[in-house]
């Protein structure tokens, strides 16, 4: 084999950025070069042939670490395959003439894949390609470029601009062109609620959430110059993306609550934060379930980086399984024990992953949970991590069917993390269904910056479950509060009876994770009638309390809930916590075109500046200030 080795000089801008990202994760130079240079192959084409040749050649050199072998031999093997392809192309030209003819490149509707119900999802692509039946120039045109990511070589201000800037042509953009911009994204409808009278509804109850998916989806729509879909904006998830100065406690969860004046209004704001106890990571049993169907072509690079981010956070002795699904599910490996040698195995096995076909996600879920159960760790972290755009076009694919499937899997005490990727055919409602009903959490990632903020920095907070079925309730004192409005949580609202019913499921909490809620309050004036709850029957005894916040939760392996409460008695200053949550709510309401949004742009800019000027909240959020500023400007 040749001594001509891949080097950093061989990497393009995107690959160099990826190389730096993998270095940050702690991988070796050869591993970083291999990971940065290789992109999951499509089922056809020269790149697929190169990978097959690479894997075959390495079998003769098994003692050489795969990444070292890849770095040292990729150039030569790739050149051999390309030379052979060029030779075949010239032979075809002599026999038949150019495939291009005078019409140029022509895209046409792909033939239906056998056993795939194409009536449910129309797929467009080029005709099947390989180096034996298509010219290299056409193949290059058809390759899906990885989605852009935001590297550390740029200033924070430039990164913030790039986060929301239209991306260059990639797979998602090509899909738009091929379908005349057809939009098949789907979201659950959100019905905004107004003020509730305390005398009519003295309690406000909701399922808590630590999800952040909505802000990832919002950023991706802006990045692709899409009109924002109001139902894609879940205010609670915008708030949860940011970090708050909330102390943990010895309890599994801790309640933080404060009331302050609402700017330019007679009303007050109630800020509620629930923080999970920070625990050391336990032994991990992780099953990575990757959607490798054709719709994931433009997400292949960020999916690979997310996978290797998870691997980098696993410790020696942890267990990893890798399952992919498209037309069918494929077990790449299972029960692999993590050690310094297994990283090379993982990288080599990654090259077997092929992006093609339809999406039978239900079969993949069945297989993933089977292996999670096979390697179940008592008192450990047992988790399925699903990466997908949610475009399930055969197998079980209705929301009701998926809910039934995942509720059954919930009984295994294996927890779920859903990582959404992509645009155009993104099925947010399906991913919400899986996460909400499967002891799961849900985030959306489309570039390296989001990956670092959501997975790398918050790994314990999305992987290590410390409580499940976590619900919150606020009971208001009618002597103090006339009416209230909960900002967000429209589709997570529950009744007072459901709050107390342990059979009513909710979402989990992970180590150090935070759930934030905000209420707008109209204050009471004069005497109120008795309606029979704590404050209504004991108004005089509780006259100094504005409300009581209650949280119910279950330990991961238990089915009986525990209850904690906190009374709120004092109106305080407009804290940085409250300012940050308030601005997030205002931005969300502006994107939703809410009739309740009344925060002037100049005040929003001021509060953003004040929140991040100094103090703990500024320190916790760092670069996120730039994103908040960019979002605030984008809705103008």
Regions picked out by a protein language model, each given a short descriptive name:
Residues 7-43, 47-58, 66-69, 73:
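Amphipathic alpha-helical segments in structured regions that serve as interaction surfaces
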Residues 415, 441-446, 452-457, 463-510:
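Polar, glycine-rich mid-to-C-terminal structural blocks
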Residues 1-2, 68, 72, 78, ...:
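Low-complexity, Pro/Ser/Thr
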Residues 143, 184-268:
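Acidic/polar low-complexity segments with low predicted structural confidence
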Residues 104-108, 122, 126, 135-146, ...:
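Long, acidic serine/threonine- and proline-rich intrinsically disordered regions
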Residues 45, 62, 228-231, 247-252, ...:
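Short helix C-cap/helix-to-loop transition motifs enriched in small/turn-promoting residues
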Residues 104, 134, 152, 253-469, ...:
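Exposed acidic/Ser/Thr-rich ligand/metal-binding surfaces
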Residues 206, 255, 270, 286, ...:
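Hydrophobic residues positioned within well-ordered beta-strands of beta-sheet architectures
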